[in-house]
Amino acid sequence: MHIGMIGGIGPASTVAYYQRLSAAVRDAGGALDLTIVNADVNELLRNNEAGDKNAQAIAYAKLIDRLAAAGAECAVITSLGGHFCFDDTVSLSSLPMISAVTPLDAYFAAQGFKTVGLMGTKIVMNTSLYGQLSQTKALAPTDTLD
């Protein structure tokens, strides 16, 4: 399967996804078929701060179209912070989308966790991971940090 990654939002997470995918495919005896496009982190930050899910989903849809043109069969956003408009992106995407939140939620539930602590960006914490956890509850710090 040719995977399309929207990277560049958090370069460290893009690298981590690449390394883990590459190792998993190699260990399975295959070769990784992957295309990465770089998202504009400044655009993402503006849209995230403004809560403009539609504008960011449109930006992602354009990147996903590039991934599809390169032969990708699915797409993933390589940053949890970039998932604030995931549902909107799914509705505009020319490719099936892979959520980074869904496997986290499933893992927590499989481990028997009903509630998990959450650390992340202000918006991630204020929305309990954008309300995308369906099997577990998220608790985040509520105090304002100086």
Spans of model-derived segments:
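Non-catalytic structural scaffold of enzyme domains
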Residues: M1-D146
